[in-house]
Structures are given as structure tokens and as C-alpha cells.
Amino acid sequence: MISSNGESESHHAAPKAPLRVLMAWRPQSTSDEAAEVAAWVGRTEEIRVRAATVIPRAWEIQPGAQEFQEYRNWVMAETQACMNAALSALGKAGLPQGMLAEEDPAVVDIAPTETKVLIKAAADFEADFLLLGSHPAAPRSRFRMGSTADALLHCAPLPVLLAPRSPKLAKNGVTRVSCSYVDTVQSHEALRRASDLAARWNVPLRLVAFSPSGATMYPTNVPFDDNSDMMVEWREQALALLDRGRDRALSRHPNLKVQLDVGSGYGWSGAINALKWKKGDLLVMGSSELGQFNRVFIGPSTNQILRHSPVPVLVSPV
């Protein structure tokens, strides 16, 4: 590198250490959504942010080669330019200077791929979240995965915070934590993290379930009757599991304000857009059951929600 618990609410009275966020910064980035989300979280509570950039390396140049000194000079110049750009984006987004990491607020490495380097950088920083921006082809206020995000969402050992392109964010930070809950082991872990964050920030927790209409969770050629007895039963089942989720959250944080909501609509887009979203919403989701223990792994349903969510999403490892 070139440098520039599961307790109940009664045990959270001690002073909290600032959340630590490793922001992945790409030198060719065309927008600053990752920096904007970092600053948004920083308006919620005091945090520490380190920017990490990986410069792709196509091949090795041996020290004795004629081009080595020229290459070394380029590396040093590019490293400084990347660190300056990342710190400038954070400053422009409104992150206070005091919330940058005390040591090495920006780091740069040169490697063939980004994934392993970012995971190691997050571990070195003891990060609570790994923050990623969207692919530039994403629609406004939506997230699309690039190759690095895709890889990290299938192997990261820590929560991954995803910033939608050109996000609309509340000036006073996170004002509500929403949690996609389906009463599985994976969503239990997401609920634990979501309820802890809501209690930490003293904001409401909203448990949400999505009920895409149709006989499957994807659009079909043959319409399905949304008013059928089956759809009514699905909604009742969703409300029942959300009730169980509320009980879990309140057993962990008895003073938490918990809201329940079910989004029903045609396909995933319709179901997600049926809910009312605020500029202060953070959506927390669990990983797929196919993932390794203590690793993020997104499945088809998670991917659909990521594509259509209009707010930043935190994907929690199992």
C-alpha cells in the first residue's frame, strides 16, 4: 500500500466508537455518489472514512528494465492524483475534515484486480462498512453493479454499503432504517444489524416485505389476477412474518419505534415503488442462503431489490 456483537440495548450505553467506513474510489469515476453517501452517514453520527483506490496493473515491469524509472514516476504521480481526487470528492460532499481517518485518509495500491485489495484494505482499517459507488450506466437514484461490486457482493466478509447514482439524500443524515425481512436466518442477521443501527441513531426501524404480483417473482407473458385469493393470502403471510420480526427487534431494543410495510405491485419494480421512500432511508438486507458463513452473497431476489431500490442499501453478511 502507498499511504497518503450481539448485545441487548441496555449494554449500548457506553460511548460508541465512530463507525469506520472504507470508501472504494475509482480514478475514472464520473460521479461522486460514494463520497455523497459517506458524507450523508457522517451527518448521522461521527464517522471515520478512508478512501481506497486500486490502480489496475496489466503486467509487471522488472526493476532493471529501461522503462522502470518512467513507470515508477508515473505510479507516484497517479497515486497522488488519485488520493487528491478522492479527498476532494469527500470534501465537496461535505464530509468534515475531522472525519477523515487520522492516519492515511487515502490509500492507493496497484494490483491486477480490485476485490482482494479492497477486502484487505477494509480489514487493515477495521472498517464497519465497505462503501461502493454505482456503475455509471445506472439510472439516476438507482444502483447497477460493475465487475468489482459483483465480486464483492459474493464474497465480502463485512457489510457492503451501496451508493445509487446521483442519490437524493436527506440533509440531516439517515432518518429511518428500513429492513427487508422474510423471517429466514439470513434476514434475522439483517434485522439484528438494522435494529442496532436504528437504536444507535435514535431513528425508527421499518420492516418491509415485497410481494411482486404474478405467479412468479418476475414479469410473465400471461397476466396473473392481483386480486385473487392467493395474493390476499400472500399479503397476510407477509404481515404475519413482519409481526414476528417486530417482536425480534423489540426484544433486542425495547424502546425502538418499529413500523411495518408491505409493498405489492407488478414485478419487483412495482412492489418496491409501491412503498413510500424518504431521502433519509437506508435499506438493510441480508445475504442469500447460498453464501459462505460470514460472507456476503446475493441471490436473485436480493439482486432485483438492489436494481430497483431508490435509496442506499447495506448488504449484511450472514
Regions found by a protein language model. Give the residues of each.
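Small/aliphatic-rich secondary-structure junction motif
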Residues: 4-70, 95-98, 102-103, 175-228, ...
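Glycine-rich phosphate-binding loop signature in dinucleotide/nucleotide-binding domains
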Residues: 121-127, 276-280
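A short acidic, glycine-rich active-site loop
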Residues: 69-82, 227-240
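Short beta-strand elements of ligand-binding domains
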Residues: 131-134, 159-166, 313-317
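Protein-protein interaction modules outside structured cores
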Residues: 236, 262-273, 279-318
